[in-house]
Amino acid sequence: TYCKAMNLIQMCGTRDALRIADDLGITVFYNNNYKNLLGMYMCRQRHRMIFLNGRLDEIWLPLVAAHELGHDMLHRDIARSGLMQEFILFHMKNTTEYEANAFASHLLLDNEEVYELAREGYDVVQIAQAMNSHINLVLIKLQKMNKLGYDLRVPVEPDGRFLRKIRQ
């Protein structure tokens, strides 16, 4: 997930998931009528689409857009086959949502910036606030950075399903 996110950032020259989606030819739709849906990714007949709740704020919009872009980059074949919808429908424990969250963390949160804030003594809440992000996304990023060789203390396990718990 890290390499795919870094390649996209380099190719598109931005960490902005909506600009990247546009560069990749992914159509983004907004709907203000979604009650419990934050976002969704679909791929039908070579048409890649992201559907976003139009009421998302400045923290949630980039996060959900990056998460759905993660599904495009990591799970397009599953989305094409329709199996991704079954995973969501039956709330099966699977790795697709966590992988999309990890991708979003790599896309939105720069390793060196996170590392510098942690070295300055910022806690997870302060890092999330400083980077205009969500605490769980920062926790996922810290875990992934440890796997990349950074030596960071992750105080608690992130809730990989945190996007599902948000209500607009």
Q: Residue ranges of each PLM-predicted region?
A:
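Active-site hotspot residues in diverse enzymes, especially metal/ion-binding acidic/histidine motifs
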Residues: 1-168
